[in-house]
């Protein structure tokens, strides 16, 4: 592998990395579709026409069950927590990274939002992509089936396993690791 920890964020994105934030910021005046056009153009170094991009975004929105006007809203402005997370998954779908880090994507979601986000990520999952899903709860893993589960304490892996480890954590908690 190649150490990219010192690379600027835009270079990491060009290499195929994506980070879904726990608390995505809002950017007034920038529409989702414009942000996606700029990001995709920079990552792929290809200029998309507005029509090409709108078709690509519309396809992803349909796949994720988002309304047609969603892409014309300002980036996370006035969004509920669930809408912010859905927007992150839309970005994930359109930008199509090789590796996605989903940092507590289930944080603040109600049952319906959790289902939309979980199923959205699950639909995007393929064998040639990697997903690092950070969560404290089993409920997200009912939709996103992990290949591996790791428990981190102070930045180090202290136990690894399969889905059964997440089920154990749901029942017993993290106390034995602290």
Language model features by range: what are they?
Residues 25-98:
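ABC-family P-loop ATPase nucleotide-binding domains
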Residues 143, 148, 152, 156-178:
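Conserved beta-strand-loop-alpha-helix hinge in the C-terminal portion
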Residues 1-12, 76:
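ABC ATPase NBD Q-loop/coupling interface
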């Amino acid at each position: 592998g190649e150490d990219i920890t010192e690379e600027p964020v835009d270079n990491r994105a060009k290499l195929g990395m994506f980070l879904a934030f726990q608390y995505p910021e809002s950017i007034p005046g920038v529409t989702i579709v414009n942000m996606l056009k700029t990001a995709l153009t920079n990552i792929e170094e290809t200029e998309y026409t507005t029509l090409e991009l709108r078709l690509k975004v519309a396809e992803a929105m349909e796949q994720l069950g988002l309304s047609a006007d969603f892409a014309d809203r300002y980036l996370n402005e006035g969004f509920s927590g669930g809408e912010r997370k859905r927007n992150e998954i839309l970005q994930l779908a359109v930008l199509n990274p090789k590796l996605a880090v989903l940092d507590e994507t289930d944080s603040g979601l109600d049952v319906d939002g959790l289902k939309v986000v979980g199923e959205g990520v699950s639909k995007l999952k393929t064998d040639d992509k990697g997903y690092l899903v950070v969560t404290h709860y089993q409920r997200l893993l009912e939709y996103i089936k992990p290949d591996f589960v790791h428990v981190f304490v102070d930045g180090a892996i202290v136990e690894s396993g399969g889905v059964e480890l997440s089920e154990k954590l749901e029942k017993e908690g993290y106390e034995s690791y602290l």
